[in-house]
């Protein structure tokens, strides 16, 4: 009987622990920087949202007036993010960043460079 009570308590703690692990959403909004061959990037406004759920990372980004795009990856060593995202015309953007308490950041590099610190969204 004692064994059943202990197992029940442990199972309850696992359920509570799992329920407390909520995804964390980070965001950045800013303007681009020119890369070789571009000249209009400082006029392009970008919104980037990154959701971290354990080691799973899902991002979405949208340049003002353009369709929303996305990427998925897993956190690397020391919270590193590194992947690529397909944008219009089949072109690619490199996605590089870091999720680290007090020092989270993101960079999209391709037709322009969009880079900045990620801040936690309210409620995350």
Predicted regions and their residues:
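Bacterial N-terminal signal peptides that target proteins for export
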Residues: 1-9
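Sec/Tat signal peptide C-region and signal peptidase I cleavage site
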Residues: 16-21
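Central antiparallel beta-sheet cores of small beta-barrel/beta-sandwich binding domains
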Residues: 22-124
């Amino acid at each position: 009987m004692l064994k059943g009570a202990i197992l029940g308590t442990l199972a309850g703690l696992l359920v509570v622990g799992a329920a407390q692990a909520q995804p964390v959403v980070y965001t950045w909004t800013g303007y681009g920087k020119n890369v070789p061959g571009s000249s209009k990037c400082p006029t392009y406004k970008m919104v980037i949202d990154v959701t971290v759920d354990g080691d799973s990372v899902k991002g979405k980004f949208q340049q003002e007036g353009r369709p929303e795009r996305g990427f998925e990856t897993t956190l690397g060593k020391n919270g590193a993010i590194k992947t690529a995202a397909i944008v219009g015309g089949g072109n690619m953007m490199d996605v590089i960043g870091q999720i680290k308490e007090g020092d989270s950041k993101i960079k999209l590099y391709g037709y322009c460079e969009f880079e900045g610190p990620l801040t936690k969204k309210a409620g995350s």
